[in-house]
């Protein structure tokens, strides 16, 4: 799990830092020990550090290429921690390509790999891995909430919480391992309840961070919403209403939908993956049975399930009373919203009705009545109206690492309570700490780093 930290390549790298295509301004970024030499070739001198200079840009043969702003940042006071040169010219693609070509005439200057500028910033301790990922998340944000969350992660709010947990685990490990390594000191780590209390406090704090990370993941990646229910409840009509188009075939024949239908939509910029499934029932039809099994596979992977029912058939709102078999199979802690469809036929008022632990919505999918209220509810489920102003963006790998750390804390607690095994507790604490450290990159494999930074755009 742990590897030695790499050092940045000795090559100087160059790339276009702005998006490809036409624009008013285009930026070429150079990073490395030869940035000053590139400046001498392109503009004839090295600009004053952190001073914008309006100068002509020339090729290696002295031919004019463009004119614009040159900025020079001296290591380590730059984004990458290396010498950095930025050439800000006009945004025509041909002009920028010629400018990059001119920089490549300097020996040992090469084109940057995707994400290599951010990678060098990480390797030079200018930011940690979670902050580096937040750069890409900020660029790709599809809503204001996602952008704000990514900025908070970039500013280190997520990393601060992870580092706090790592520090707490470090102190607890020192205490436990001291009792193991120095038995003559007679440190009884069970007698005063310190270990148990610390474990409880750390687990509680980790659970809180996990909850925030899951919310942040929904902002970044979108929420998987599965529409489930019996045949002819109106699931496909609801998919069409949310998607704003006829994505699914709708008929009065029960069992029309036999396979999984997926639509990627945005509600006020918030990404959702809406999944329509086959009606759930016992069936002798082989094709329909396969569709039902696929429906359950989607349900088990969902972030939220819309439990669809025909309001003309029951006045009951409690899903356990309506369909106990469905609720018993539903994954524990699954977010569930009850949808009472066909309000136009049952005469029910359109809107939200709260029932115990499950929000209940009365609507008419075919007439698109009550859809806006449901859309607001889905936005709230993603944290659109979250009262937590400190919401940060997180990725699936972050959640996986937190969950693994949580598992090891629980295992350590069991070893302590069942076996009084201090050595095994210490090992579980070490593993929990290592998984959390993967988030910020303190312990990360080369494969993980390569995968993360390769997903960045070239100039980042």
UniProtKB/Swiss-Prot annotation:
Enzyme class: hydrolase
One cellular-component annotation, GO: cytosol
Essential cofactor(s): K(+)
Entry keyword set: Cytoplasm, GTP-binding, Hydrolase, Magnesium, Metal-binding, Nucleotide-binding, Potassium, tRNA processing
Residues that bind (6S)-5-formyl-5,6,7,8-tetrahydrofolate: 29, 86, 126, 460
PANTHER family for this protein: TRNA MODIFICATION GTPASE GTPBP3 (PTHR42714), TRNA MODIFICATION GTPASE GTPBP3, MITOCHONDRIAL (PTHR42714:SF2)
Designated name of the protein: tRNA modification GTPase MnmE
Organism: Pseudoalteromonas atlantica (strain T6c / ATCC BAA-1087)
Lineage: Bacteria, Pseudomonadati, Pseudomonadota, Gammaproteobacteria, Alteromonadales
Gene: mnmE
């Amino acid at each position: 799990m742990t590897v030695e930290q790499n050092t940045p390549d000795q090559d100087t790298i160059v790339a276009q830092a702005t998006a490809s295509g036409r624009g008013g301004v285009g930026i070429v970024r150079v990073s490395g020990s030869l940035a000053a030499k590139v400046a001498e070739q392109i503009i004839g001198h090295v600009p004053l550090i952190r001073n914008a200079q309006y100068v002509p840009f020339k090729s290696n043969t002295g031919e004019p290429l463009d004119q614009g702003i040159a900025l020079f940042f001296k290591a380590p006071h730059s984004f990458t921690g290396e010498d950095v040169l930025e050439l800000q010219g006009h945004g025509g693609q041909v002009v920028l390509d010629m400018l990059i070509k001119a920089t490549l005439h300097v020996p040992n200057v090469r084109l940057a790999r995707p994400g290599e500028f951010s990678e060098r910033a990480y390797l030079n301790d200018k930011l940690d891995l979670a902050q580096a990922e937040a750069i890409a998340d900020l660029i790709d944000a599809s809503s204001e909430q996602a952008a704000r969350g990514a900025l908070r992660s970039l500013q280190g709010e997520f990393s601060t919480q992870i580092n706090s947990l790592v520090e707490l685990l470090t102190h607890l490990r020192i205490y436990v391992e001291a009792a193991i390594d120095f038995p003559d000191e007679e440190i009884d780590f069970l007698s005063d309840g310190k270990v148990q209390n610390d474990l409880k406090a750390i687990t509680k704090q980790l659970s809180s961070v996990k909850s925030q990370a899951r919310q942040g993941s929904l902002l970044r990646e979108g929420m998987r919403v599965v529409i489930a229910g019996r045949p002819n409840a109106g699931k496909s009509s609801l998919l069409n209403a949310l998607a704003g188009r006829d994505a699914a075939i709708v008929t009065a024949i029960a069992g029309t939908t036999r396979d999984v239908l997926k639509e990627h939509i945005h509600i006020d910029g918030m990404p959702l993956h809406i999944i329509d499934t086959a009606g759930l029932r016992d069936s002798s039809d082989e094709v329909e049975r396969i569709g039902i099994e696929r429906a359950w596979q989607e349900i088990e992977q969902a972030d939220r399930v819309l439990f669809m029912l025909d309001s003309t058939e029951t006045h009951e709102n409690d899903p356990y009373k309506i369909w106990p078999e469905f609720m018993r199979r539903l994954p524990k802690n699954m977010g569930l919203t009850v949808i009472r469809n066909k309000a136009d036929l049952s005469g029910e008022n359109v809107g939200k009705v709260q029932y115990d632990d499950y929000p209940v919505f009365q609507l008419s999918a075919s007439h698109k009545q009550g859809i806006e209220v449901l859309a607001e509810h889905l936005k709230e489920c993603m944290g659109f109206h979250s009262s937590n102003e400190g919401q940060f963006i997180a990725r699936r790998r972050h959640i996986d690492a937190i969950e693994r750390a949580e598992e090891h804390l629980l295992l350590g607690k069991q070893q302590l309570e069942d076996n009084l095994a201090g050595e095994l507790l210490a090992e579980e604490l070490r593993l929990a700490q290592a998984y959390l450290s993967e988030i910020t990159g303190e312990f990360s494999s080369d494969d993980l780093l390569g995968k993360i930074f390769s997903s960045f755009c070239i100039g980042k």
